[in-house]
Amino acid sequence: MPHTRRLYPILGLVLGAACSNSESTRPDATQVVDTSSSPVTMSVVGRGDFKPSRTTGEIAVRGTTAYTTTWGNNTTSSAFYIWDVSGTPVLVDSVIVDGARTLGDVAVSDDGSSLVVATESSGSLATYSLASPRKPVLLSRFAPSHITAGVHTAEIGRVNGKMYGFLSIDPGGGAKAQLVIVDLANPAAPQELYTITIGSPYVHDTFVRDGLLFLGLWNDGVAIWDIGGGGKGGTPSAPVELGRVKTVNGKVHNIWWLKDPVTGSNRYAFVGEEGSGSIGLSSVGDVHVIDVGDMSAPREVAFYTVAGAGTHNFSVDEQNGILYAAYYNGGVRALDVRGTLGTCTEAQKSLPAGSGVALCDLRKMGRELGVGLLDRGVPIYVWGVQYLGGAVYASDMVNGIWKLRSVSRP
């Protein structure tokens, strides 16, 4: 039976960048300005009729089932929620994670066999069997003493066929932020392989693909490591750094390295910048495009900005070359990311806020394809998005989840 709880007033809660703990106290909702001329309004299939007792966090979707976490401290335990998303999202169940006051990240393995949930305060990685996708069964709770400050994000991915977890550990209790790499070949018995203190002041997120690991190091920029596919002898237990770049304004929150199956291009990675914000009201931060054609010397070449709103997480429909970005109070944004992004006319360049160097502006290049959820008539605050099978699923911190139709290429 679905578990439903009353939504406490949260529009005045300070997000302060939900992930960064910085603060903003702007009293009124920021007007989101859309200056582009051609993006379509993304159509909405439906909204999950559910208002949690706290704010909705990350979302992961597999088949017709979605999983969402709850963000915001609780004095006892938190739950993640399970949804039927075959049509309009419907809440079907929830799972309590004992002793976890906040749940941040959630991810499903590529084969659909397991689910991982990152817990903060106290930190751990909870791994569940998805033999029955809507009845997860706890397999293990990885919680060594040095991660108790909190696991903020947990990326899972394969390196040479073997599953690993990449955990971004919060600073706290006098300890600095850490990256922890875990062997998840046996999800019932995770094995720690590698730990390093890194990030300024956070290592916020990672992205793993083809034996390369991209790290979001907040004000230390983006680092690229060989962990089995970079040709420098790196492994998950002994990574080798290939290159690093600092993006405009820092605050590197998340990364997606694009591999376009149609063009064969793997030249660009997309970086989210998360500034300060207030839940349901305001946010700040751009999408930055870095050219990684030379992994030893990555460089920022383009950006996308929304006046009055900031980005959070991405999902990319790589087959069609479309990036979907969660944009907090700016809804969902769909961007054309196929082809050359770092070359443009002078008229297509702009100065990113905080920079004195003009870069290609994706909006001026006509790359904005769609905008979603600004037509709903209610405050929105989109934390995460996932593209899957022609639909875009969005976790909204103040409204539960939405299911939208994807956009088409022009």
Stretch-by-stretch model annotation:
Residues 1-9:
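Bacterial N-terminal signal peptides that target proteins for export
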Residues 9-10, 337:
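General helical structural elements
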Residues 12-13, 353:
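Residue-level signal for mature regions of secreted extracellular proteins and peptides
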Residues 16-18:
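C-terminal motif of bacterial Sec signal peptides marking the signal peptidase cleavage site
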Residues 21-410:
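Feature marking well-ordered beta-strand scaffolds used for ligand recognition
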